Regions:
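Terminal accessory carbohydrate-recognition/targeting modules of carbohydrate-active enzymes
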Residues: 1-166
Length: 166
């Protein structure tokens, strides 16, 4: 706890760390709901393992095996008739597309994992949370600054696959 009343962040990465994929792809975060489900990815939100996913749950109808239900989100900020995809995916070899990690200004995972993006004339905060003992993934966006009207497009990338299969 700092004298000004703010909490000190212990799990925090700044832009120069996040944009360096050699560094940031090795930094992973996992959160559980205390009921068997979890959310796991890298700090730049690039799934590099078959066990990664935003909502991974045991499915009773399949013997309680864990399934990746929500793999990732494609989030696009539309500002001044320009589209900025904040996502990143890794393909065979070291090919990445889109390269939305370059818009991340800050990553913090102390209480609720959050990323702050600077995209065009917009500063956007994204927070993610799993509900305790429920198979629910919560997502909140906060517009911290927007010099002009903007739109936010969110597309879920659903998988529904066993965590051991690709």
């Amino acid at each position: 706890f700092q004298p000004n009343g703010n909490y000190m962040s212990y799990i925090k990465f700044e832009k120069n760390q996040v944009v360096n994929l050699e560094y940031s792809l090795g930094k992973e975060i996992i959160r559980t709901n205390r009921g068997g489900s979890y959310s796991s990815t890298t700090i730049v939100d690039c799934n590099t393992r078959k066990y990664h996913g935003l909502l991974v749950c045991p499915v009773d109808e399949f013997g309680g095996e864990r399934f990746v239900l929500l793999s990732s989100l494609d989030v696009t900020v539309v500002n001044n008739d320009r589209s900025f995809n904040t996502g990143i995916r890794k393909y065979n070899g070291d090919y990445f597309s889109p390269k939305g990690h370059k818009y991340i200004e800050d990553f913090n995972a102390d209480n609720i994992p959050s990323r702050i993006y600077r995209v065009g004339g917009v500063i956007l905060k994204q927070e993610r949370l799993l509900v305790h003992y429920e198979e629910q993934f919560l997502l909140r966006f906060t517009i911290l600054e927007a010099s002009e009207p903007m739109k936010l497009q969110v597309r879920p990338f659903l998988a529904f696959r066993n965590i051991h299969q690709l």
